[in-house]
Amino acid sequence: MNLTHINEEGRARMVDVSDKDETKREAVAIGSIYMKSETLRRIHEGTIKKGDVLAVAQVAGIMAAKNTSHMIPMCHPIMITGCDISFSLDFENSKIDIKAVVKTVGQTGVEMEALTAVTVAALTIYDMCKAIDRDMVISEIMLVKKSGGKSGLYEREV
């Protein structure tokens, strides 16, 4: 198997994408944060002391997508053309499902940006609620779709 992020000396390198065609690309990632039912209720009611948890988490997720290349060493800086973060409150399972959709037109995909957006949104929820619930669990973060580029469409069965 040819490792694309390793040079001839066996050292890390950023892949050269300059010869790749620019294409419209999209990535969708999801994840969940489980919490006590009381915590979920308070988020829903807007009574968390630190403020509007989902509004802050949404902005944090978007900012994270835009700054992925600053956190993940081999990620290329990408001009993101769109980023949307959505939340679904699941009272039956006492969790919040998070979804990030990231778009660009470029030479490399935005999978890492979508995954980073979901992760940071979940971490932000944790941060804003940890005073009342330290048992929260962030899990099930995964890429569910990517399109564009040479490899085309990928969709995970969920």
UniProtKB/Swiss-Prot annotation:
Domain of life: Bacteria
Catalytic machinery residues: 127
Annotated residues for binding of substrate: 74-76, 112-113
GO molecular function, one term: cyclic pyranopterin monophosphate synthase activity
Catalytic activity: (8S)-3',8-cyclo-7,8-dihydroguanosine 5'-triphosphate = cyclic pyranopterin phosphate + diphosphate
Matches recorded under PANTHER family: CYCLIC PYRANOPTERIN MONOPHOSPHATE SYNTHASE (PTHR22960:SF29), MOLYBDOPTERIN COFACTOR SYNTHESIS PROTEIN A (PTHR22960)
Function in brief: Catalyzes the conversion of (8S)-3',8-cyclo-7,8-dihydroguanosine 5'-triphosphate to cyclic pyranopterin monophosphate (cPMP).
NCBIfam families: moaC, PRK09364.1
Protein name in the entry: Cyclic pyranopterin monophosphate synthase
Gene this protein is translated from: moaC
